[in-house]
Amino acid sequence: MENEAKIKVFLVDDDAVFLKSLEIEFIHHTDYIVETFATGELCIANLDKKPDVIILDYQLDGIDKNAMNGIQTLDQIKQFNADIPVIMLSSQDKIEVAVSCMHHKAFDYVVKSETSFLRLQKAITAFFNFEKIEKELNWYMSRMS
C-alpha cells in the first residue's frame, strides 16, 4: 500500500513507557503510519504533517508542569483543523472528564487499561466507517437535488 493511502496516527502522551508500548502495538498490528509526541506543544508544531487521527492523553503534565494539558491541546488542534478526529486517552474513568472532552469536540474517550489498544483501534475504525457513510450520504443527497 502506498504511504498516501495509509492512515497517519499521532500518539501524544507524556508517559514514555505507555507511549512506546502503544506505538509498538500500532506498528505490529496495523498498517498505520505512527508518529509519537511527548507534549501537546510538539503535536501542535507538527500538525502540518496532516495526521488522519490523533490519540491524545488528557493529563500531559508528567514532563513539565507548565505544559499544555490535553484539553488545551485539543482546543488548539480543533482551531488548526476542526475535522481532525481526536481520541482522548486518560487513566481517569470519571464521567465528568469524558463529558468535558466531548464538549471540546473529541471524537471519543478511552480509559487507559490493558485493552486500550483494542478500544483505540475500534474507535479509529468507527470514525473512518462513519466518514465513509457520511460521504456516500452526501453524494446521494446531491443527486436528489
Regions from the language model: what does each represent?
Residues 1-10, 15-23, 133-145:
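Non-catalytic signal-transmission and effector/linker regions of two-component phosphorelay proteins
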Residues 55, 85-88:
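Hydrophobic beta-strand core positions in alpha/beta domains
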